Amino acid sequence: MSQSNNVTDLARANIRALTPYMSARRLGGNGDVWLNANEYPLGTEYQLTTQTFNRYPECQPKHVIERYAAYAGLPPEQVLVSRGADEGIELLIRAFCEPGQDAILFCPPTYGMYAVSAETFGVERRTVPAQADWQLDLPAIANNLEQVKVIYVCSPNNPTGNLINPADLQAVLALAQGRAIVAIDEAYIEFCPQASVSNWLKDYPNLVILRTLSKAFALAGLRCGFTLANSDIIQLLLKVIAPYPLSTPVADIAAQALSPQGIEQMRQRVSEVRANRAWLQSALQDCACVEQVFTSESNYLLVRFTASSSVFKVLWDQGIILRDQNKQPGLANCLRITIGTRQECERVIAALAPLAGIDNSNNIDNQSKTHSQTSSIRKGTI
């Protein structure tokens, strides 16, 4: 074996070539209005009720599991708690995918961690682009299932904000039966709880649901997520999860957030976010620099601008940090705006109002131009 003085040469080739997921915090910025990470804009207050920091925590804290199971309407044996839903994404790959042999499948534009997690473990990333209306391309999925072990579907989808048709989700589950796990990412489901498919678990043994406390529960800094599945899958995931995934303070606060009082507070936050979302969606229509505001079932809006790079910089310079989505398929000139407080939403509109519109139709890629939701260059909502 050849020797090298560069220790990075010792790393796996796929890791050396890996482009890491660029989280909102990695991208940085010096703003005071953070609307780029789909966080709740205000802090929450909790008091620790236990001080047993000298002892290792339980792998699966009973009080957290039982409270989330009650909240989700499931038996405790169908719930696993982890360091955010991102760890749940990774656990599925570790448990079900053979590196260098199996693949995962997802449908861009969607959440970026599916791809990064697969690449980290040496598992093929297979993409089937969403259709023009951002729904699933079922025939294409059916034609790309060879060696696929996990299919990830985000609903509501990040960054587009739309729900995936339930009939299409059932079709994917049927296509994958006996072949692959179907993981439905419900990170934003609290903003549209009627759309949850958790009651399908009894009918589909290959269904997994990913959840989090980062969004509506306003605990992004806690790093606490949940995987819902049949007990056989949960037992497999317990084989590969870290021995102490949740620290004692995290488990303590998570249990408080899942108390009846905590759940009621979460629902009040959801109501507030919905009201601010409706206000911002309406106000954006009057901005000359806005081409399209896409209807969302989540805590963010996807907006197509006439010149998104200019808009992004103008707001950045005013301390308002948004999320650029230009590199996602079909999202040319699109920025994602997290729903902040009413005051923060008003600052966004105040910054956008002076900006003139630009005829940028020639710069929108062909996929965007044929997108049924944006087939005409005009303002509106969908």
UniProtKB/Swiss-Prot annotation:
The keyword Transferase applies. The keyword Magnesium does not apply. Keywords: Amino-acid biosynthesis, Aminotransferase, Histidine biosynthesis, Pyridoxal phosphate, Transferase. The modification N6-(pyridoxal phosphate)lysine is found at K215. One of its GO terms (biological process) is L-histidine biosynthetic process. Transmembrane segments: none annotated. Its cofactor is pyridoxal 5'-phosphate. Belongs to the class-II pyridoxal-phosphate-dependent aminotransferase family. Histidinol-phosphate aminotransferase subfamily. This is Histidinol-phosphate aminotransferase.
